[in-house]
Amino acid sequence: MSIPSILRKETLKKKDKNIDLQENNINDLVVSASRVIAPLWPISTFAAHHPWMGLEKQSFEQVANWLKEARNVDIYPSASMIHSAKAKGEIEESFLQIALSRWLDSQSFHMPRETAERFCQEALKLERLPSSLLSSPELNKLAEEINYVNTGSMKDSSMQPISSLIENQNGDNLSDILNYHIIKWCKLYLDDAGASWAMPNREKGFYRAWQHLITFDPALSKTERKVLKDWPEDALIALTKALSELGISESNMQAYLEGHLLSLPGWAGMIRWRSQQSIEEQELLIEYLAVRLSMELAIVKPYLPLKNQKVEKKVSIVPLIASWIYWGDISIEKWLQMSATEQSELLAFAYRFDENTRKKLWLEAWEQTHAEQLREKIASKQRATHDKKRVVAQLAFCIDVRSEPFRRHLEKLGPFETFGIAGFFGLPIATTELGSNDSHPSLPVILKPKHQIKELTDENECKSYEQRKMVGSSVRYTFKTMKQNVLTSMLLPEVSGPLLGLQMVTRSFVPRRVGGFIRNLRKNMLQKPDTTFSLNHVHDTNCEIPIGFTKEEKVNYVRQTLKMVGLTEGFAPLVVMCGHSSQSTNNPYAAALECGACGGAAGGFNARVFATLCNLPEVREALSAEGIKIPDDTIFAAAEHKTTVDELEWIYVPELSETAQEAFDCIEAIMPNVSQHANRERLMQLPHFKTKIKNPSKEAHRFAEDWSEIRPEWGLARNASFIIGQRELTQECDLEGRAFLHNYDWKQDESGDILANIIAGPGTVAQWINLQYYASTVAPHYYGSGNKATQTVTAGLGVMQGNASDLLPGLPWQSVMQSDRETYHSPLRLLIVIQAPTKYIERLLNNNFTFREKVQNGWVRLASVDPEGRWKNW
């Protein structure tokens, strides 16, 4: 078999078969093509998502190879990341050897095993081939001699937009010009907050609004405007016509649409998210593609037809030969002495053991090292014996990794028991705070709210509160109006300069004091009166979802949550539901530090609603009849864990029983110590601190109030595992704030439904968070959002670099990097550890096809710990 045919065969093996055109319908093609982008939520409700959620039917390896080929995006850790991790002891060499041996066993080759192993061992050092070798005349002459047959071996890459293949007379790529225009139109249409003048005809939809304006666009030439002058009024017809006139064959249409969606994945992701929010905009992605391809046609029409619209990349055998010379110790003289069959065998092997394969093995070794270290921590805890202490209070925290250190110190310093559960506490609600007409879905973005809960108070108190709020709103509105008005904007610097100048100086030099003063002033002015909730079911035809709960629903949600964490008996005198929130200043990514389980909002509202439900006599009576007996002196309260300063703020404390009051006083007494310990542990991870911190709480507050601080906290960086089991499994284990912790008692889950719900809900959210951090670390230029210091907040939607970039979809550099050269986040795929018998895991995988697919395709890793403490990797 010839060298080209062998390489072509290997290419087809590695090719990601993401395109399989079956339908002629453009609607179906757009839906299929949209899998290559992920919905992008507005930054104000920043929701974790992973960019490959539509591609999970393929393996992680296939998607990695496809992205490398189609967009030159590498989603495996870089060589520098791998070397750094190895130097820090995060990668055991033995696991790399196991991964290599497993890979070699899966391959078919006829050379001696020792030869293959020696080549791989050298290649795994991840050294670049010397440029002097690659450019040497002897090597290139050898490549020409070996390539004695027609080198028809091609990498059939995805079809690129025609505009990306053409440059104008100034040397500018037409795809860059097209992107500039599309960004401008997207900003105009999607703006919900920034512009004083809305886009004309916006209510008619993106395409129609664009069509009314495009022929007046001075940024287009007269010839380009002429092409679009009599363009169809229907977006679908326009898209079909553009594809036809661009000469895109039916078999290439989906690939072509994918190429355009991947050109600006941020803006396309925002468009896709908007299309999922309302019936009126459900065709928005079609409209976006119609606008984009119509404009592409206008820009490239003078250059049509092109001779070859499909990019074909030949596989160069020069680096393949060079790799055997450099890593396999096969000289040019030896190459010339080989037969064609032997040469083909070596080249095919080098082609298979490419850079992606090498990095894949390193990643697997890195992940296995982490899994083994976690197993040893859990095993050492199980071997130790601890006396069961009397518990005076039980506190339920969100599964968020930032809760783990706080819980650990809390349990160590006092007679407390903690639980982990998704921070929306199983309540599928949309919340409306006092004095607001807007509701916010306070649950994971993968779910839809079923109930609306309003915060209520006495009518007179409400009016007084609204008047106080209106004062602040009026000042902000006046400032914004003056800033955006043509005439008053020139006067604004004179009017506001002294005040804003004073704010700048004080915020910069004494941030903690000024921040505390402003926060206290705001708190005093906007002090909420005592409030209640609209908990009882009310049928309102003006609301899309019902207000409040029926009695059965109240009981059901409380029962479901208590069973999910295994808290159905042994209640302490005080049970505290702890939501969490963050505290930072001048931070566009503030929502990213809030509760992901509450849709990028604080979790206190849900915690308070749930605690209130648990205190209702009707709920307790119904639960008692089912065997869940909550003692009369047990009181449920609610608090909010402030993750930036590691403090617990009480938000709902009803009248307490005597024993509950004692527990409350106990928590209050030790909380300063808990905050000090948790803050010290967290702050020492920040790059600013290398020595002992005298006053951790004071420093934490400074970080929270400093408006120049680009890293008030690490957020969920370094997350690596999701442990589902009883607290005894990990109690007193220092998990370094890297684990999501969800309580689960398999003995109370005979049907397996509770475990299935944990995997489908919190498990999915944890996976999305994990892969968003992963993507922002390994490919920050494509999936991250760059440097916070140079970002521009755009249209109230997200951030850009400058004023004409893609809408940046991921996390900023400061969220994942320790410095310019050192990462902080370890890019590992999430390890899900379940404490349950083997048959529970088998049943879960058999019944949950989606989860089984994620495990098999390498999007998550799975391990279990059986009742005897035995660890099993799945």
From Swiss-Prot:
Keywords, ordered alphabetically: Cell membrane, Membrane, Metal-binding, Transport, Zinc
Q: Where in the cell is it found?
A: Cell membrane
The record gives the membrane topology as:
Peripheral membrane protein
A Pfam family name for this chain? DabA
Q: Which residues bind Zn(2+)?
A: C398, D400, H580, C595
Q: Name one GO cellular component term.
A: plasma membrane
Q: Which coenzymes or cofactors are required? A: Zn(2+)
GO MF term list: zinc ion binding
**Keyword match Zinc:** yes
- What does the protein in this record do? Part of an energy-coupled inorganic carbon pump. Expression of both dabA and dabB (DA2) restores growth in ambient air to E.coli deleted of its carbonic anhydrase genes (called CAfree, deletion of 'can' and 'cynT').
**According to its UniProt record, which protein family does this protein belong to?**
Belongs to the inorganic carbon transporter (TC 9.A.2) DabA family.
How does the record describe its quaternary structure? Forms a complex with DabB.
Q: What is this protein called?
A: Probable inorganic carbon transporter subunit DabA
Q: Which organism is it from?
A: Bacillus anthracis
Chain's gene name: dabA
